[in-house]
């Protein structure tokens, strides 16, 4: 028996729970929480400061004010614990119970809870099936509602005005009952039979056909079923008892001068109590109905204000006219309970100070000011002082520390040793924003930071501050040391590139040391070793940049891998190099060849160097190497003594002439404009074009002049070498500045933009060296100011995007090693406009192969499915010319409630397969959100330079190889023997000798092909040409032209060209046609053969009809003979409006929010043949006949550009009307893989434009979360409702159960939710409530009696548990296993004892109950 008791004791100690349930409280429940009724509105006595009895702060209800002391002072001290004083009625206990004890107010008349009334959709309205307006009229005493119609013709829930009511009473007497106010609504709620209603609704759902009704019923059914399942009674939405918050949570603090500061809640409660007491009195006095009614209405309004002030009517205001802060306001928003106190706590043992550079530190160290350390490590010092016997008590120890005796400093040194601290720089945009360092005590008051970690923190030393936190427990120290130490975080989690890359001075120093000069001092000397070079250099016999020959010893990996053999062996070889490079070779880590250093080290090169070191030599060697590179860089930069002066800015000699020519051209355009030859817009575009070209030309001339300098070589010949100009070196090395900036210093500043983004056509021809005049300076300020305003906006927007991303992915954690799926996506190199934008190797690096990778030549398997493709693997794949690899992806992972390691692949921040427990969702969100501030905010208006560049009229090959056409390419040969493309989506590829795709080009409709399939070509060969300014309509059949509905003045108009004098027919807009009849006709062409019969489409009975669009210029005449491939009409493309491209941050947000673009393109719903039906007003009708012969119609606005023509075969999901794609359509018609490809590519386009690298897998992780809900199509035997959206994992679990029980599973379709919507629709109500729309989320959850299983990270942070990620995941797993074994042990003991005493055994109840 004792064992049993022990176990119970154990359980009671700490509250362990696995879930939290939320529900509506019944009146009895509220009374059971309460410690007494609050009857008076008084708070505290202003003279004695003692709480009034029965008031809002009453000590009898809520507990004593001082620990273990009753109010009147009769009982004091611990010995009376638990006694209730007979004089003042206060229980003697701890004062902190005033934080947890609740009271209640018995309401004289029931009151509706405003959340369930006004939070849309109104829950009360749904349950009662009445409109919100009607319920409000009843609740606020403006109308009666029929409760029981009796034998009268009235209907239940009918609304009637007061006048009506009295008439009906006269007519029917007391045959019927009607009420007003919350009592009436409560009666109605009580009269509802939920089970019956649910049955009726289910049958109605099955039988009804109307969409609107189905939606309405499904919504109501969902709410009613929630009540049914959760056991919550609907009439609890009407309050009879109001709980009162514990007084410590709504404090009243006396200020000096006899005034009080109080929480707004006290005011609100006071109003409720006052009105409630007044109502009680009125009821006792049997006051007239109208007065009572008014008082009841006021009580309802007072309670509304207390719960959610301002939701209905005007907000209640305090004395200072500002709205009072109600209970709802306490929890929602940035300053509410969730975001302010639960997710954003302040941390003890922390400090902050300014940072300064600490170039002498090692990478894992930081300099901590002594005074700061003393304060932060106080408890550790106290402990040490006691242990050492220096101080006897904590008080004495405190004195020692305050006096800062010498022994304290010694102890501080000891305490701090090997105790890492965490440094954080706000804003913490990704996980490298907090790193751990070993502190080194320093004098002064600023924290010293290692220069190489600045990139990760995005810190600089212009006054940035950082915060220090001390991990206290041993576990925390261990985690800080192993997981967060700066030297263990050398790669960016976003893209796997090294984060400890040198920048600025270091780069400049290394670059200067590794440059080579012609005819430097000591050129051509040979040295036997590096030490000899150093000696020569120190004696000024050679210069750093002189070319010399040196014997260099490299440590290479030993081929012999047997036991005891050394890992590296020396290898000596003679290199032609420079003095600087030879000197640098001393710091190369073993395993790297000298060739990696034997080139000028620019920033990119250094980054590549560190990356190579990491992959080849491991983490430790890399960290040491980076540190040494930094030391050398600083030293060499100092030795170099590079500085810049005005003379370094060389203004090109040709500048005047270039600018003069441009001005002449501009004058010429002005003249043309004046004489009316060009429009104002054309003139503006041309002027802007000329100036941007000029500015480029000046820049080019300047760079040519800057980048080389004349020099005499050893043989006395004059040659040119790369320049040693300081400004040029800074930009070229990547240390600071860019070609654009140099162009502004020494070339010309060029065109400036107005704040609205349009370009000012007057350029700034001066540069900073020559100086700007007043007008030029003014134009400059215009753009600069806009830049600053933009930056401020951008930061806020970017932060909000990150917050939404984190919220949608926060519960995605790697929970298992392998889900065993064989699905994946096919990865190809990303090609755009013929350029390889991203090579295949970059896209598959660090992924797991989904199917075997096979050598195309020998057909042998190189890598089996399930292999992690590392650097060597991708190099093999690239070498063998494999151009497509199927890899696992987060999108197809079959793990429920998480991801598996194989589908995710490599953890980019560590360089190895991701660990179980890694919070990959948050990392993905951070990786996408962190560079958000670098993206632009603006929408690009295509105009001027941009649009001119976009007009291409031919496509040429960039590499040698063989031309291949895709399957969609169709072309015909015309009379001249030219091949004319008649497909809309044809592409030409160039493949190399082993069949690998090298480039791919879209070839537009109507282009002339110059090379055919299979042709061998050289780089630079033209593949196709076309007219960029018009879009042709081409016939695929020959014959005689027969016009239909082509009537001058009705459907077409004659246009006479001013210049040539020729007339052409142009199709006019429907809106401009005169008569009603002519609006529906469509001008078109039929073809007649030699016998005068209409030419039919081969294999069908349809005649060939070729329709003309609005604006088409008809180039053939009626009755003219045409050949195959001839042009019938041309549509000028100038008429296409230039679309604004949404760029930057707004575009990323738009994609992740899955917004349907306005004027979206239309995709074909089915595979079939197109034809045009009868046009309606302003719309044209496109019909697709599928293979079964069913017709699908699309109505398309006339101004839209239809991409298909009559009788064309289209595939499902192909675009048929031009416009931006709608992601929802892509998902529906092309599936998940196509959708993910679309979103990934579009997001990457935005980031690539800014030069930001993000790995695809992060975007895929977000897309997975956007797809995490499915819509039920047919519910089978499951508990779901058709049309309901449910979590995919729940759906699959439920289906598994159905299949196991032999019932019908549900069918579903994927739906795409934007990130905000996805966050709000998560299963965890705690997470959703802390994100946005707190009220709505909590209302819904309470009605459903939702249970939060605490799966995600956010919920666990809020309830204060370890998060189920990283070490926390292991902790929770272990805890659950232990609980399981405890339970088994418990059952076993119970069984044994039952056996002993002969009583029947009962299995133990589970000790966990969801916490209410």
UniProtKB/Swiss-Prot annotation:
Zn(2+) 2 binds at residues 819, 893, 900, 903. One of its GO terms (molecular function) is DNA binding. The gene is rpoC. Pfam families: RNA_pol_Rpb1_1 (PF04997), RNA_pol_Rpb1_2 (PF00623), RNA_pol_Rpb1_3 (PF04983), RNA_pol_Rpb1_4 (PF05000), RNA_pol_Rpb1_5 (PF04998). GO terms for biological process: DNA-templated transcription. Keywords: DNA-directed RNA polymerase, Magnesium, Metal-binding, Nucleotidyltransferase, Transcription, Transferase, Zinc. Zn(2+) 1 binds at residues 70, 72, 85, 88. Binds 1 Mg(2+) ion per subunit. Binds 2 Zn(2+) ions per subunit. It catalyses: RNA(n) + a ribonucleoside 5'-triphosphate = RNA(n+1) + diphosphate. It comes from Burkholderia thailandensis (strain ATCC 700388 / DSM 13276 / CCUG 48851 / CIP 106301 / E264). It is an enzyme of class 2 (transferase). One of its GO terms (cellular component) is DNA-directed RNA polymerase complex. DNA-dependent RNA polymerase catalyzes the transcription of DNA into RNA using the four ribonucleoside triphosphates as substrates. This is DNA-directed RNA polymerase subunit beta'.
């Amino acid at each position: 028996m004792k064992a049993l008791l022990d176990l119970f004791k154990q359980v009671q100690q700490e509250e362990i729970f696995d879930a939290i349930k939320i529900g509506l409280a019944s009146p009895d429940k509220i009374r059971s929480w309460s410690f007494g009724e609050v009857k008076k509105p008084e708070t505290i006595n202003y003279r004695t400061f003692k709480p009034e009895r029965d008031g809002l702060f009453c000590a009898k209800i809520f507990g004593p004010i001082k620990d273990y002391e009753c109010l009147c002072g009769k009982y004091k001290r611990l010995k009376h614990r638990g006694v209730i004083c007979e004089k003042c009625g206060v229980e003697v206990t701890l004062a902190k119970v005033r934080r947890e004890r609740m009271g209640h107010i018995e309401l004289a008349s029931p009151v509706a809870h405003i959340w369930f009334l006004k939070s849309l959709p109104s829950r009360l309205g749904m349950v009662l099936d009445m409109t919100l307006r009607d319920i409000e009229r009843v609740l606020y005493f403006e109308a009666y509602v029929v409760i029981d119609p009796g034998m009268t013709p009235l209907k239940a829930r009918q609304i009637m005005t007061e006048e009506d009511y009295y008439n009906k009473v006269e007519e029917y007497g007391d045959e019927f009952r009607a009420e007003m106010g919350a009592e009436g609504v409560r009666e109605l709620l009580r009269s509802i039979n939920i089970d019956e209603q649910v049955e009726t609704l289910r049958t109605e759902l099955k039988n009804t056909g109307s969409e609107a009704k189905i939606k309405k019923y499904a919504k109501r059914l969902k709410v009613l079923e929630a009540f049914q399942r959760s056991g919550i009674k609907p009439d609890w939405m009407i309050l009879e008892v109001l709980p009162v918050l514990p007084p410590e949570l709504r404090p009243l603090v006396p200020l000096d001068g006899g005034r009080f500061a109080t929480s707004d809640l006290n005011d609100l409660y006071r109003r409720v109590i006052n009105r409630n007491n007044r109502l009680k009195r009125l009821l006792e006095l049997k006051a007239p109905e109208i007065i009572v009614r008014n008082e009841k209405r006021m009580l309802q309004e007072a309670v509304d204000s207390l719960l959610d002030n301002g939701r209905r009517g005007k907000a209640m205001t305090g004395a200072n006219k500002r709205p009072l802060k109600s209970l709802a306001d306490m929890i929602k928003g940035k300053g509410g309970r969730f975001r302010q106190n639960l997710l954003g706590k302040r941390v003890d043992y922390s400090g902050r100070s300014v940072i300064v550079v600490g170039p002498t530190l090692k990478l894992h160290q930081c300099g901590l000011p002594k005074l700061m350390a003393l304060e932060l490590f106080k408890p550790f010092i106290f402990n040490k002082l006691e242990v050492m016997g220096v101080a006897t008590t904590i008080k004495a120890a405190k004195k020692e520390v305050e006096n800062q005796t010498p022994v304290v400093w010694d102890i501080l040194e000891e305490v701090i040793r090997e105790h890492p601290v965490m440094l954080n720089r706000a804003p913490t945009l990704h996980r490298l924003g907090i790193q751990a360092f070993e502190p080194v005590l320093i004098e002064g008051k600023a924290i010293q930071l290692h220069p190489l970690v600045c990139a990760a923190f995005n810190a600089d030393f212009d006054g940035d501050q950082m915060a220090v936190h001390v991990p206290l427990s041993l576990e925390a120290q261990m985690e800080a040391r192993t997981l967060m130490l700066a030297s263990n975080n050398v790669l960016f989690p976003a893209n796997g590139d090294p984060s400890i890359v040198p920048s600025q001075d270091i780069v400049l120093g290394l670059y200067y040391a590794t440059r080579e000069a012609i005819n430097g001092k000591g050129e051509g000397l040979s040295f036997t070793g590096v030490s000899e070079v150093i000696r020569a250099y120190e004696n000024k016999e050679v210069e750093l940049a002189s070319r010399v020959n040196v014997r260099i010893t490299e440590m290479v990996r030993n081929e012999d891998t047997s036991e005891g053999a050394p890992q590296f062996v020396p290898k000596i070889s003679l290199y032609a190099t420079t003095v600087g490079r030879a000197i640098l070779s001393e710091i190369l880590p073993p395993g790297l060849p000298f060739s990696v250093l034997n080139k000028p080290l620019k920033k990119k090169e250094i980054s590549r160097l560190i990356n190579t070191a990491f992959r080849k030599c491991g983490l430790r060697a890399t960290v040491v190497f980076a540190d040494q590179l930094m030391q050398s860089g600083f030293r060499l930069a100092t030795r170099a003594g590079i500085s810049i002066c005005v003379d370094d800015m060389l203004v090109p000699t040709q500048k005047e002439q270039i600018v003069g020519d441009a001005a002449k051209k501009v004058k010429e355009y002005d003249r043309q404009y004046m004489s009316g030859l060009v429009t104002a817009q054309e003139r503006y575009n041309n002027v802007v074009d000329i100036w941007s070209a000029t500015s480029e030309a000046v820049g080019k001339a300047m760079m040519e002049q800057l980048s080389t300098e004349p020099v005499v070589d050893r043989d006395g010949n004059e040659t040119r070498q790369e320049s040693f100009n300081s400004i040029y070196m800074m930009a070229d090395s990547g240390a600071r500045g860019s070609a654009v900036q140099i162009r502004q210093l020494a070339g010309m500043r060029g065109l400036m933009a107005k704040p609205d983004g349009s370009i000012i056509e007057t350029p700034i021809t001066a540069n900073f060296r020559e100086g700007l005049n007043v007008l030029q300076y003014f134009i400059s300020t215009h753009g600069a100011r806009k830049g600053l305003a933009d930056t401020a906006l951008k930061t806020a927007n970017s932060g909000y995007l990150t917050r939404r991303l984190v919220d949608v992915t926060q519960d995605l954690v790697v929970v298992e090693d392998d889900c065993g799926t064989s699905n994946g996506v096919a990865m190809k190199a990303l090609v755009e406009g013929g350029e390889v934008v991203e090579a295949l190797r970059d896209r598959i690096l660090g992924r797991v192969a989904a199917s075997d990778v096979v050598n195309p030549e020998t057909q042998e398997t190189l890598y089996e499915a399930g292999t992690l493709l590392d650097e060597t693997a991708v190099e093999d794949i690239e070498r063998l010319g494999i151009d497509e690899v199927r890899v696992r992806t987060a999108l197809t992972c079959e793990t429920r409630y998480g991801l598996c390691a194989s589908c995710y692949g490599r953890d980019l921040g560590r360089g190895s397969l991701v660990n179980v427990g890694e919070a990959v969702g948050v990392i993905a969100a951070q990786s996408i959100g962190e560079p958000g501030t670098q993206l632009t905010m603006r929408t690009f208006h295509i105009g001027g330079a941009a649009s001119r560049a976009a007009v291409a009229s031919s496509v040429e090959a960039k590499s040698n190889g063989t031309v291949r056409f895709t399957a969609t390419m169709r072309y015909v040969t015309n009379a001249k023997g030219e091949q004319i493309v008649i497909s809309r989506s044809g592409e030409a590829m160039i493949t190399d000798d082993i069949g690998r795709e090298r480039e791919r080009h879209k070839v537009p409709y109507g282009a002339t092909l110059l090379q055919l399939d299979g042709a061998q070509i050289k780089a630079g060969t033209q593949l196709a040409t076309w007219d960029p300014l018009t879009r042709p309509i081409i016939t695929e059949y020959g014959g005689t032209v027969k016009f239909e509905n082509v009537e001058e003045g009705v459907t077409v108009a004659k246009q006479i060209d001013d210049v040539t004098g020729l007339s052409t027919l142009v199709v006019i807009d429907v809106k401009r046609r005169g008569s009603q009849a002519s609006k529906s006709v469509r001008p078109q062409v039929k073809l007649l053969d030699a016998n005068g019969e209409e030419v039919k489409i081969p294999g069908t009975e349809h005649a060939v009809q070729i329709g003309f669009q609005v604006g088409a210029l008809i180039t053939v005449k009626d009755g003219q003979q045409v050949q195959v491939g001839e042009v019938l009409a041309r549509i000028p493309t100038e008429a296409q409006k230039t679309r604004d491209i949404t760029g930057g941050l707004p575009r990323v947000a738009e994609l992740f929010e899955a917004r349907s673009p306005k004027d979206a393109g239309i995709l074909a719903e089915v595979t079939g043949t197109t034809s045009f039906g009868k046009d309606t007003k302003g719309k044209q009708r496109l019909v697709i006949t599928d293979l079964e012969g069913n017709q699908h119609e699309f109505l398309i606005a006339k101004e839209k550009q239809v991409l298909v023509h009559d009788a064309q075969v289209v595939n499902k999901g192909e675009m048929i009307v031009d416009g931006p794609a709608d992601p929802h359509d892509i998902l529906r018609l092309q599936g998940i893989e196509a959708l993910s490809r679309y979103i990934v590519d579009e997001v990457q386009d935005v980031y690539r434009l800014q030069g930001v690298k993000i790995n695809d897998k992060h975007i895929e992780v977000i897309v997975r979360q956007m797809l995490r809900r499915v819509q039920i199509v047919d519910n089978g035997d499951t508990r779901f409702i058709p049309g309901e959206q449910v979590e995919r994992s729940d759906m699959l679990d439920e289906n598994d159960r159905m299949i196991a029980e032999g019932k019908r599973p549900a069918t579903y379709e994927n739906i795409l939710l934007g990130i905000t919507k996805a966050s709000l629709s998560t299963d965890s109500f705690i997470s959703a409530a802390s994100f946005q729309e707190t009220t709505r989320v909590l209302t819904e959850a309470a009605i459903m009696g939702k249970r939060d299983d605490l799966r995600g990270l956010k919920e666990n942070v809020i309830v204060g548990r370890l998060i189920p990620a990283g070490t926390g995941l292991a902790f929770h797993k272990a805890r659950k296993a232990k609980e399981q074994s405890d339970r088994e042990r418990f059952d076993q003991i119970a069984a044994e004892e039952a056996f002993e005493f002969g009583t029947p055994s009962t299995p133990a109840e589970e000790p966990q109950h969801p916490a209410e």
